[in-house]
C-alpha cells in the first residue's frame, strides 16, 4: 500500500474510533434533557450517537429479549435527521429547548411523516396531511421524533392492547399490564428507548402508565395545551401532556407544549396563565409550608390495596418530613367509582368527535365510527361493547342523560375547587391506582383515580412513590405512583411540590428486564 494511502486509512480509522468513543462516553440510561444538552455542548456526545444508542436498545428489547412491544413505528430517518442536527450544531446553530432530544409519541398524535392509527387495524396506514399542534411545537423546539408507541386501541381502555400492535408488557413484571392507554410511551421511557414522550388522557391515560412504570405524568389544566391534531375521545374530558422520567423534564416539555391554538378554542382560557418557564418552579424545598389534603376517599381498604397503601403511607411521611402540613379530606362526592358510572360522558361525545376527526383526514381508511365498526378490525375483547354503545347514540349531545351529566360535572368542579380553597390547600394527594396494575389478560384496569381531574379539567401530576414488595416475577417490585391534584392553572405549584418530593425520595428505578447493553 502506498505510504500516503496508509496515512489516510489510519486517519479514517482514528476518526471512526473517535466518533464511536464520543458516543460511548455518554451513559444513555436514565439520561435527562439537561444531561444530554451538557454532553452535546461539551463535545462528549453527538446527536447521531445518542439516537443510535436508543435504536440499539429498541432493537434489543422491544421485539427480542423481554419483547416489551412498546413501539408501533420507528422513524426510518432518525439517524439521518440526527446527523443533520449535528452538522447544524457544528455550524453554530442555537441549542433549542429540545435540541436533539429523542421523543416518542403515543400513536394518536398526527405526524406528517408517519402514520397515525390509534393502534387500530381499521386505521392502518392513515397518513395525516400535517403535524398536529404539539408535534409542530416539538419540531420547532429541536426535538427528534424517534417513533410512535403502542397504546390501548383508540385510547379507549387501560391495559395497552391493540389490534395493530398487540399487547404491551410491563417491564417491571412481564406478565403484568403497563397501565394505559398511553402504555407504549410509559414502557418506552421506563426501558430507556427515548428521553421523553407524550400521552393523551381522557380518564387516566397519561398518569396510569406513569404510575405503572415509575415515571412522571402530567395531565394539564383543560385549555393549557392544544388537543388539535390528536385522535379524540371526548371534548369534555380529553387532554394531552408529557410523560417523562423526571419532573424537570416534564417542566421543559410543558414549556414547549403549552400555548394558544385557535384550532382548539378552549386554549383561550390559558392565555395569560403560562409562566415564562415552568422550570423556574423546580424547588427542592417546595414542600416546606405547603398545605396538602390527603383525599382518603381515594384509598382502598381491602387486601388487594395493602401494597399500594404501604407505599403511600411512607410517601405521606416524606411529605411531612419535607415541611408539608397534611389535612385529612373525606368527601364521598369524590369517589372515583361513582364518578365513572354517574358522570363520565365519553359514550355520548365519542361518535361526534371521531367522525369529525376522520372527516378532516385526506384519505382515511374509514370515514366514520360506523364504518370502523363494520370492518371488524379492532380489539373486540375490550372495545366491542363501548363502540356499539357510542354508535347507538343518534343524538348524543342532546340526550337528557348527557345534559344531566354535564350539569353534574359543573357542580363537581365547584365542589372540588372549594375543597381546596376552604382549607387553603395547594393540592390534594392520593394514589393514582388503589391497587397494582392488573395482569395481562384482564381487560379492566381496575380502581384508578384519574377521573376526578379528567371530569373537572383540573391539573394533576403523578410521580414515582415506590415499589411493591419484590417477587419472583417482579424482582424489584411493581411501581406505585402518587398523584397531586391542584386548582386550574396551578401547574407551577404542582411541579414545585412534585419536584420536592422527587428529590427527597429518588424513588424511580429502571427495570431489570432492560439492563445497559454490553459496552454501552
What do the PLM-derived regions correspond to, one by one?
Residues 60, 191-296, 301-302, 313-322, ...:
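Structural helix-boundary/capping segments
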Residues 125, 267-272, 399-403, 423, ...:
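Short, surface-exposed loop/helix-turn segments at secondary-structure junctions
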Residues 18-19:
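N-terminal signal peptide c-region/cleavage motif recognized by signal peptidases
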Residues 99-118, 280-297, 347-417, 462-481:
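Short helix-loop capping/hinge segments that flank enzyme active sites or metal/cofactor-binding pockets
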Residues 118-120, 168-169, 181, 231-239, ...:
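Flexible glycine/proline-enriched surface loops and loop-helix/loop-strand junctions
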Residues 1-9:
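Bacterial N-terminal signal peptides that target proteins for export
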Residues 25-203, 221, 245, 289, ...:
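Gly/Ser-rich catalytic/binding loops embedded in alpha/beta enzyme cores
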Amino acid at each position: 500500500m502506498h505510504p500516503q494511502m496508509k496515512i489516510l486509512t489510519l486517519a479514517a480509522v482514528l476518526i471512526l474510533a473517535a466518533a464511536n468513543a464520543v458516543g460511548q462516553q455518554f451513559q444513555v440510561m436514565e439520561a435527562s434533557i439537561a444531561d444530554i444538552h451538557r454532553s452535546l455542548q461539551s463535545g462528549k456526545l453527538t446527536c447521531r450517537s445518542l439516537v443510535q444508542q436508543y435504536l440499539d436498545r429498541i432493537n434489543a428489547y422491544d421485539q427480542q429479549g423481554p419483547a416489551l412491544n412498546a413501539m408501533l413505528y420507528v422513524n426510518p430517518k432518525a439517524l439521518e435527521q440526527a446527523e443533520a442536527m449535528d452538522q447544524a450544531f457544528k455550524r453554530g446553530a442555537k441549542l433549542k429547548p429540545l435540541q436533539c432530544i429523542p421523543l416518542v409519541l403515543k400513536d394518536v398524535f398526527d405526524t406528517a411523516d408517519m402514520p397515525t392509527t390509534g393502534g387500530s387495524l381499521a386505521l392502518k396506514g392513515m397518513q395525516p396531511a400535517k403535524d398536529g399542534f404539539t408535534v409542530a411545537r416539538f419540531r420547532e423546539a429541536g426535538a427528534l421524533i424517534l417513533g410512535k408507541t403502542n397504546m390501548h386501541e383508540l385510547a379507549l381502555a387501560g391495559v395497552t392492547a391493540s389490534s395493530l400492535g398487540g399487547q404491551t408488557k410491563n417491564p417491571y413484571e412481564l406478565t403484568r399490564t403497563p397501565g394505559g392507554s398511553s402504555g407504549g410511551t410509559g414502557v418506552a421511557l421506563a426501558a430507556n428507548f427515548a428521553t421523553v414522550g407524550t400521552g393523551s388522557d381522557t380518564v387516566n391515560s397519561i398518569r396510569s402508565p406513569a404510575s405503572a412504570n415509575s415515571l412522571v405524568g402530567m395531565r394539564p389544566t383543560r385549555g393549557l395545551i392544544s388537543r388539535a391534531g390528536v385522535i379524540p375521545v371526548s371534548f369534555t374530558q380529553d387532554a394531552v401532556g408529557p410523560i417523562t422520567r423526571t419532573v424537570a423534564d416534564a417542566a421543559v416539555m410543558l414549556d414547549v407544549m403549552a400555548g394558544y391554538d385557535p384550532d382548539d378554542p378552549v386554549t383561550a382560557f390559558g392565555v395569560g396563565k403560562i409562566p415564562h418557564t415552568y422550570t423556574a418552579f423546580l424547588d427542592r424545598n417546595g414542600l416546606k409550608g405547603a398545605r396538602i389534603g390527603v383525599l382518603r376517599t381515594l384509598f382502598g381498604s381491602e387486601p388487594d390495596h395493602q401494597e399500594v397503601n404501604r407505599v403511600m403511607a411512607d410517601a405521606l411521611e416524606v411529605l411531612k418530613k419535607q415541611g408539608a402540613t397534611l389535612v385529612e379530606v373525606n368527601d364521598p362526592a369524590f369517589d372515583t367509582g361513582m364518578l365513572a358510572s354517574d358522570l363520565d360522558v365519553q359514550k355520548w361525545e365519542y361518535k361526534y368527535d371521531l367522525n369529525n376527526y376522520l372527516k378532516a383526514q385526506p384519505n382515511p381508511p374509514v370515514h366514520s365510527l360506523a364504518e370502523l365498526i363494520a370492518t371488524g378490525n379492532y380489539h373486540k375483547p375490550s372495545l366491542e361493547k363501548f363502540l356499539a354503545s357510542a354508535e347507538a347514540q343518534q343524538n348524543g349531545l342532546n340526550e337528557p342523560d348527557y345534559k344531566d351529566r354535564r350539569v353534574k360535572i359543573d357542580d363537581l368542579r365547584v365542589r372540588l375547587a372549594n375543597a381546596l380553597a376552604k382549607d387553603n390547600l395547594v393540592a390534594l394527594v392520593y394514589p393514582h391506582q388503589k391497587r397494582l396494575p392488573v395482569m395481562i389478560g384482564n381487560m379492566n384496569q381496575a380502581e384508578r383515580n384519574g377521573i376526578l381531574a379528567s371530569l373537572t379539567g383540573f391539573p394533576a401530576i403523578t410521580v414515582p412513590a415506590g415499589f411493591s414488595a419484590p417477587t419472583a416475577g417482579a424482582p424489584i417490585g411493581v411501581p406505585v405512583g402518587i398523584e397531586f391534584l391542584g386548582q386550574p392553572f396551578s401547574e407551577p405549584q404542582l411541579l414545585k411540590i412534585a419536584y420536592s418530593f422527587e428529590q427527597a425520595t429518588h424513588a424511580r428505578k429502571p427495570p431489570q428486564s432492560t439492563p445497559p447493553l454490553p459496552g454501552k
